[in-house]
Amino acid sequence: MKQVQLSAASWDTPGKAHQALAKALEFPEYYGHNLDALYDCLRDLRDVQLVIEDCAKASEQMEKWSGFLSVFFDAASENPYLQIKLLPGNGDYGD
């Protein structure tokens, strides 16, 4: 399983979050940079563990963070080949 690790510390707008996710997860060029498109792309990933650190910082800075959380939860629930770990800070918090 491929692990993709990101820090959400600089995600103060939805656009920055979408850009970082699209680049790290190699989304197609037609990726729409919205929550529906994020869900679709996450649902289609295979054998990926996405680890996002500094989620507490993103939740403080970004008004729409709860929408991203919903998409992460829904996509991981729908896609058995995708694991998503959301860590409040930076570092290894175990499994």
Regions found by a protein language model. Name each.
Residues 1-95:
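Positively charged, polar, low-complexity stretches
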